[in-house]
Every structure is written in structure tokens, then in C-alpha cells.
């Protein structure tokens, strides 16, 4: 699951990366504390990029949904955990790895959020296997 960092926030002593994907796209961490490795792809690769500083930070990762449980870094029981990641900035891409198999089939349109595209990576090659849902797809089949 490839997400974009939309905000970097501090709450008390904890730092949060807020991304544009929520538990509606990957429910496993919220449902039972499933662990997914994460990696960062910096948008800015220049010499002043935070990711190139070598600095690493303990961060919690959350989504945009209006639910306190919209946290990708939680343990079984719903406790917020952190991950050691390179320093991130708004616009960087955060990859939540090993999200395949159950990612799409457990996804929902909660909060009227369209589902993301699905990409299969095999042998170092990526290909689109399901297109991103459009607003038209989201409301298809509804009548007023």
C-alpha cells in the first residue's frame, strides 16, 4: 500500500505521520494489530531532504478517517505503537508493505472513500491489476 504523507504532527511526546490512506484500505492493523513493515520514499531527494539527513525517528502512523483507531502502527488490543523510520516530510511516500492478499478484499468505502489502485509486484516488475475507484464507481448503483 503506497500512501502519501499529508502531515507531520506532535501530540505530547509522540510524533505522528498522517497519511492519505486509512483503515478502510488496510483493516488488519486496526482489527487485530497485524504488523506490516514500512519504508519511506522521499519526494525530495535533494541534499536538504529530511530523509537524506540520516536521521531516524520513532513515529506512529495514522490515516485521515474520523476515528481514533485509524492507526496503522498499533498492537493487538489497539495500543498505539511506533516505528523506526527515516525522517519524513509532507509529500513523501510511505510504503506499507505486505498489504496484498487481504488488503483489497477487506477494504471498504467507509466515509465514502474510493479504494486505491491495486498493483502487483512480481520479480521486480510492477503492473496494475485493479484501477483506482472513481467517484462515479463509488456511487454507481445508487438511486435517488
Please give the residue ranges for each predicted region.
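Charged (often Lys/Glu-rich) extended helix/loop segments that serve as interaction or gating elements
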Residues: 1-144
Amino acid at each position: 500500500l503506497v500512501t502519501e504523507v499529508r502531515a507531520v504532527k506532535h501530540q505530547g511526546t509522540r510524533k505522528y505521520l498522517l497519511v492519505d490512506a486509512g483503515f478502510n484500505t488496510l483493516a488488519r492493523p486496526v482489527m487485530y494489530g497485524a504488523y506490516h513493515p514500512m519504508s519511506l520514499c522521499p519526494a525530495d531527494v535533494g541534499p536538504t531532504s529530511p530523509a537524506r539527513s540520516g536521521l531516524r525517528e520513532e513515529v506512529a502512523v495514522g490515516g485521515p478517517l474520523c476515528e481514533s483507531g485509524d492507526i496503522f502502527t498499533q498492537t493487538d488490543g489497539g495500543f498505539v505503537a511506533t516505528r523506526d523510520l527515516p525522517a519524513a516530510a509532507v509529500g513523501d511516500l510511505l510504503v506499507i508493505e505486505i498489504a496484498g492478499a487481504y488488503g483489497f478484499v477487506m477494504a471498504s468505502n467507509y466515509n465514502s472513500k474510493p479504494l486505491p489502485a491495486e498493483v502487483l509486484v512480481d520479480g521486480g516488475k510492477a503492473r496494475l491489476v485493479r484501477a483506482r475507484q472513481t467517484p462515479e464507481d463509488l456511487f454507481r448503483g445508487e438511486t435517488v
